[in-house]
C-alpha cells in the first residue's frame, strides 16, 4: 500500500511538469482556467484545462466549500476495476460545483466484484445513495479466440454478462439505489485491422456486442444508468485516452490527464439524478441564432439557411436548440432589438426556430440581466435554472456576474456553439417522463392563464373561471418515476427538501404506515400533470409530514389546500389525531416559511437555524379549505 501511495505522488509530480497534450481542449485554450476572473471554481466550466484541474484540486475544493452555497449531501460508492483515487477526487470537485456535497466509499484496487457480491460490513454501514462501477475493457475476463465457434463466442458473451448482471442485481436488492455502470471503450489496437468490427472473433465486435447487452439491461431496468466511456474516449482521442504507461505503472485504465473528462461525465449523471439539471435557455438573437444584426442588415440579409456555409452553421445550431425543446426544455429570448425586428428575424423563411417555439421573447433595450430575471420570474423558475447563450462576452459577463448561479458558457465561434453547449452537461437526461415532454405546452398554457387573470378584479373568480379539476390519490406505479423526479427537482415550494430515489418512492408506496399522495391538476387550458406530492408517515396517532412539495407552475391555484383536505380525510380513516409538519430552511425555499400557519397549524418549536415544527389537531368539525378545484377520485 505504501508503494502504491508513492506512485500516486509520482503522478502528481508528472502532472506539474507534463505538457498539455490534448489538442481538442487545453491545447487550444492555454492557461484558460487561470484567466477566468481569477477564481479556481471557474476552471470547472467547459472547455476546461484538465491539467490545471488535476494540479489545483485542493485549492479548487477549498474555494467551493467556502462559497456559501447550499449543498445537497449524498453518499457515493465507487467500485473500481482499476485505480480510482483521482477519479474520485476530481468527481468531488464537479459535484461541489453543482451544489452536491458527496461522501465516498472507494473499493480497493480491482475489488469491485467482491465488494458488490460478498458481504462487506464497511460498504453496508456506508449505505450508498448512488453506486458507480468503474470498469473498462481491462476488466473483460476473456475474449474470443480465432478458433472459437459462434456458439462458443455466444457463451463467452453470456458468461461475461452473468458476471455483471449478478453483481447489479445483488447491489439493487441490497441498496435500492441508482447504479451507474461504465460501458466498454474500444481497444487500443486491432489485430485484424478493419475486420475487427465485423468478424465475430474480433475484440471490437465482441465489445460492441457486450455494450449492446449493457444497453438492453439499462432499457429494461429503472435506476440503472450507463456512463458512455466508449463515446467519451473517442471524443477525447482513443490513443491518448489509453496511455499504456499509466496502466503498467499505476493501474489507471485511462490517461491521468483524461480523468477530468470521465469524472465530469459521471458527475453530470449524478447531478441529473439529484434534480440539478438546468431547465432551459435564454438566447440572444443577432450573431447567435443567425448571422448578422437584423435591425441593421434586414431580414433578407441574415445568414441562415442552406444557401451558404455561414447560414448552414446557424441553421444547424437552431435545429440543435429545437431538439432540446422536444425534450421538454423551455426556450426564451433576451435580445437588444426592437420587438418587431426580432419577430421578423424569427419568421425568416429559412429559419428552423419560429416565434411559437419560445415561451418568452424579451426584445427591447433593457439590460439583459433584467430581461433574464423577468423571464425566470414569469416562468416561476429560479434564474439559475436557465442557461444564457450569447455571442457577446460582455453580455455573458454581466448576466453571469449579476445573477447568482446562472451559467453563461463561453461558446466561441459559431461553428463551435453546438460542441460547447453539448459538452457543458447542462441537460444530462437520466429519465424522461410524459410531463417532461409536455413542459413547453404547460408553460405556454400558463401564459394564457396570466392573460386571463389580468381581466379579473376578484382572484377567486379568476380561479373558478379556470374550471380546475384535480386528482389526488395514493402513489401509483405509473407515476413513481415522475414523483421521484419532482422530489429531486423541486426546491422553492418544498418544506423539507428530502430527496427520494424511485426505489424509495416504491417502498413508501407499498408501506401502509405511510400516506403518500400525488396531485394532478387539469384546467380549461390544459393538463399540468403531476404537480404536488405529500408523504405522511403515521406513527401511532400522529402523521409526520416527511415531504410536502409543489411545482411552481401551479402556485396560487389552491392545490395545496386540496392536498391538505385529502390528507386530513385519510388521516381520519386511519384514526390519526394529529398531523406534525416540519420546515427546514434552505437558500431557496423561503416562500414556504409560513406555509403551515396558512394551513392552520400551530408552531411548537424553532431552532437557531430557523427550522420549525408545527402541529395540527384533527377534529370532527374540520372544514375543507379548497373551494375552487373539483376533485376526481
Regions found by a protein language model. Give the residues of each.
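Extracellular glycan-modifying ectodomains
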Residues: 4-24, 28-282, 289-290, 295-301, ...
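A conserved beta-strand-loop-helix scaffold within acyl/acetyltransferase catalytic domains
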Residues: 475-543, 547-550
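Basic, amphipathic juxtamembrane/active-site segments
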Residues: 294-319, 405-411
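Substrate-recognition element of Asp-dependent hydrolases with the DxDx(T/V) motif
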Residues: 316-347, 361-362, 399, 482, ...
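Acyl-donor binding region in acyl/amide transferases
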Residues: 521-524, 530-607
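Conserved Lys-Pro-Asp/Glu-containing loop-to-beta segment of HAD-superfamily phosphomonoesterases
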Residues: 372-393, 399
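Terminal substrate-recognition subdomain of acyl/acetyltransferases
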Residues: 400, 404-466, 569-633
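Glycine-rich phosphate-binding "P-loop"
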Residues: 42-57, 302-309, 348-367, 374
Amino acid at each position: 500500500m505504501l508503494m502504491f501511495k508513492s506512485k500516486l505522488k509520482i503522478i502528481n509530480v508528472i502532472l506539474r511538469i507534463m505538457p498539455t497534450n490534448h489538442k481538442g481542449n487545453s491545447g487550444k485554450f492555454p492557461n484558460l482556467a487561470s484567466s477566468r476572473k481569477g477564481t479556481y471554481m471557474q476552471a470547472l466550466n467547459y472547455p476546461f484545462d484538465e491539467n490545471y484541474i488535476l494540479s489545483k484540486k485542493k485549492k479548487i475544493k477549498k474555494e467551493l466549500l467556502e462559497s456559501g452555497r447550499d449543498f445537497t449531501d449524498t453518499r457515493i460508492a465507487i467500485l473500481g476495476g482499476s485505480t480510482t483515487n483521482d477519479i474520485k477526487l476530481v468527481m468531488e470537485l464537479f459535484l461541489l460545483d453543482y451544489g452536491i456535497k458527496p461522501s465516498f466509499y472507494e473499493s480497493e484496487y480491482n475489488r469491485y466484484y467482491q465488494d458488490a457480491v460478498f458481504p462487506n460490513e464497511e460498504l453496508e454501514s456506508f449505505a450508498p445513495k448512488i453506486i458507480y462501477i468503474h470498469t473498462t475493457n481491462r476488466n473483460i475476463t476473456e475474449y474470443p479466440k480465432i478458433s472459437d465457434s459462434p456458439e462458443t463466442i455466444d457463451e463467452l458473451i453470456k458468461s461475461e454478462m452473468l458476471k455483471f448482471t449478478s453483481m447489479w442485481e445483488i447491489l439493487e436488492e441490497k441498496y435500492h439505489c441508482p447504479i451507474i455502470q461504465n460501458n466498454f471503450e474500444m481497444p487500443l489496437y486491432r489485430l485484424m485491422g478493419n475486420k475487427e468490427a465485423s468478424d465475430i472473433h474480433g475484440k471490437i465486435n465482441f465489445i460492441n456486442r457486450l455494450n449492446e447487452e449493457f444497453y438492453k439491461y439499462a432499457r429494461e431496468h429503472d435506476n440503472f444508468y450507463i456512463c458512455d466511456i466508449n463515446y467519451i474516449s473517442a471524443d477525447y482521442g482513443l490513443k491518448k485516452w489509453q496511455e499504456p504507461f499509466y496502466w503498467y505503472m499505476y493501474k489507471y485504465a485511462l490517461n491521468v490527464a483524461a480523468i477530468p473528462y470521465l469524472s465530469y461525465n459521471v458527475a453530470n449523471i449524478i447531478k441529473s439524478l439529484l434534480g440539478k439539471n438546468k431547465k432551459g435557455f435564454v438566447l440572444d438573437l443577432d450573431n447567435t441564432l443567425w448571422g448578422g444584426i437584423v435591425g441593421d442588415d434586414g431580414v433578407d440579409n441574415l445568414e441562415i439557411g442552406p444557401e451558404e456555409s455561414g447560414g448552414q452553421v446557424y441553421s444547424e445550431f437552431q435545429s440543435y436548440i429545437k431538439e432540446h425543446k422536444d425534450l421538454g426544455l423551455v426556450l426564451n429570448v433576451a435580445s437588444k432589438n426592437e420587438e418587431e425586428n426580432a419577430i421578423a428575424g424569427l419568421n425568416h423563411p429559412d429559419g428552423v426556430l419560429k416565434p411559437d417555439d419560445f415561451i418568452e421573447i424579451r426584445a427591447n433595450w433593457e439590460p439583459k440581466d433584467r430581461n433574464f430575471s423577468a423571464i425566470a420570474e414569469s416562468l416561476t423558475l429560479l434564474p439559475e435554472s436557465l442557461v444564457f447563450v450569447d455571442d457577446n462576452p460582455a453580455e455573458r459577463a454581466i448576466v453571469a456576474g449579476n445573477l447568482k448561479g446562472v451559467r453563461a458558457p463561453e461558446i466561441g465561434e459559431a461553428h463551435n456553439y453546438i460542441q460547447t453547449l453539448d459538452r457543458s452537461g447542462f441537460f444530462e437526461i437520466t429519465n424522461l417522463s410524459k410531463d417532461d415532454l409536455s413542459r413547453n405546452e404547460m408553460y405556454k398554457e400558463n401564459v394564457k392563464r396570466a392573460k386571463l387573470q389580468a381581466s379579473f378584479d376578484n382572484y377567486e373568480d379568476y380561479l373558478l373561471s379556470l374550471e380546475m379539476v384535480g386528482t389526488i390519490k395514493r402513489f401509483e406505479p405509473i407515476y413513481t418515476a415522475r414523483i421521484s423526479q419532482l422530489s429531486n427537482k423541486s426546491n422553492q415550494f418544498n418544506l423539507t427538501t428530502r430527496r427520494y430515489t424511485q426505489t424509495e418512492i416504491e417502498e413508501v408506496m407499498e408501506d401502509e404506515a405511510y400516506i403518500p399522495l400525488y396531485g394532478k391538476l387539469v384546467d380549461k387550458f390544459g393538463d399540468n400533470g403531476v404537480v404536488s406530492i405529500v408523504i405522511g408517515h403515521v406513527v401511532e396517532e400522529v402523521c409526520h409530514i416527511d415531504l410536502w412539495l409543489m411545482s411552481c407552475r401551479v402556485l396560487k391555484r389552491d392545490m395545496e389546500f386540496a392536498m391538505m383536505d385529502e390528507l386530513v380525510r385519510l388521516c381520519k380513516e386511519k384514526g390519526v389525531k394529529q398531523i406534525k409538519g416540519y420546515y427546514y430552511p434552505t437558500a431557496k425555499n423561503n416562500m414556504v416559511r409560513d406555509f403551515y400557519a396558512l394551513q392552520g397549524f400551530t408552531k411548537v418549536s424553532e431552532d437557531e437555524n430557523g427550522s420549525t415544527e408545527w402541529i395540527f389537531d384533527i377534529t370532527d368539525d374540520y372544514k375543507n379549505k379548497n373551494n375552487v378545484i373539483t376533485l376526481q377520485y
